Amino acid sequence: MPVQGSQRRLLGSLNSTPTATPHLGLAANQTGARCLEVSIPDGLFLSLGLVSLVENVLVVTAIAKNRNLHSPMYCFICCLALSDLLVSGSNMLETAVILLLEAGALAARAAVVQQLDNVIDVITCSSMLSSLCFLGAIAVDRYISIFYALRYHSIVTLPRARRAVAAIWVASVLFSMLFIAYYDHAAVLLCLVVFFLAMLVLMAVLYVHMLARACQHAQGIARLHKRQCPAHQGFGLKGAATLTILLGIFFLCWGPFFLHLTLIVLCPQHPTCSCIFKNFNLFLALIICNAIIDPLIYAFRSQELRRTLKEVLLCSW
């Protein structure tokens, strides 16, 4: 994805030197300020991408195989896995191509590399946007299932879910193409940051409201069975811990990347900001880590999906 100082990374690899920074790193700070730069080895970067790729392929395969999982909720989970798969796959492809170019093992004209870079950028950006959208869609789906339980199947139908999925993919591709074309405009970067904050607020509000309803429900059950208050408090603490982990992982994995975009707009030449820019590889690795964690949170907790996944793995042997 084009960002200040790292755009056209594949083209830069055609004339690379042994000190060139691979995939998505920014130029070294020229101000002389001491910076903390976390180096992400190419092997680690590719390994994270491979783990994410395998995990999300398994999720998509299991949902596609089991007709019992062809519901709106699993439709969103499947699309989230597909988005995460594309995030990991596109970055693995870019890293591999850059390494091959730098090693001289791949010969390509600049025009071909330019087109490949553009395609990878669009895939990466659109899959990131769609991943955020599907995280929000899953939160909305769960909210409706709790607060409108009796009407859920009439509100969230499979045709509506499919239309929502199609709209998300189309919008993600279109906006990613706009971003790639106008990445040097501050308004475009700020729109991406606002979009991330909107998704964060949406998820926080919905999940906090769901936690409050669950605590009220648990309290009602405790009163019905004349239980003591500590049982309800324990449920509330467990729910709060789960919510903190869910939102915390989302913020920690995605936040640094969007902080990077914000600082490009606010202080592109400031020494401190330049130090942060040098850790862009780390920020991207965190997003790939989120792609690894998403299946654990949203998919593998389903007993039906785990059973189907076991069948898929046994059949593959």
From Swiss-Prot:
One of its GO terms (cellular component) is plasma membrane. A lipid is attached at residue 315 (S-palmitoyl cysteine). InterPro entries: GPCR_Rhodpsn, GPCR_Rhodpsn_7TM, Melcrt_ACTH_rcpt, MSH_rcpt. It is a multi-pass membrane protein. GO terms for molecular function: melanocyte-stimulating hormone receptor activity. Residues 1-37, 94-118, 184-191, 267-279 are extracellular. CDD domains: 7tmA_MC1R. The chain crosses the membrane at residues 38-63, 73-93, 119-140, 164-183, 192-211, 241-266, 280-300. Interacts with MGRN1, but does not undergo MGRN1-mediated ubiquitination; this interaction competes with GNAS-binding and thus inhibits agonist-induced cAMP production. Interacts with OPN3; the interaction results in a decrease in MC1R-mediated cAMP signaling and ultimately a decrease in melanin production in melanocytes. Belongs to the G-protein coupled receptor 1 family. Receptor for MSH (alpha, beta and gamma) and ACTH. The activity of this receptor is mediated by G proteins which activate adenylate cyclase. Mediates melanogenesis, the production of eumelanin (black/brown) and phaeomelanin (red/yellow), via regulation of cAMP signaling in melanocytes. This is Melanocyte-stimulating hormone receptor. It comes from Chlorocebus aethiops.
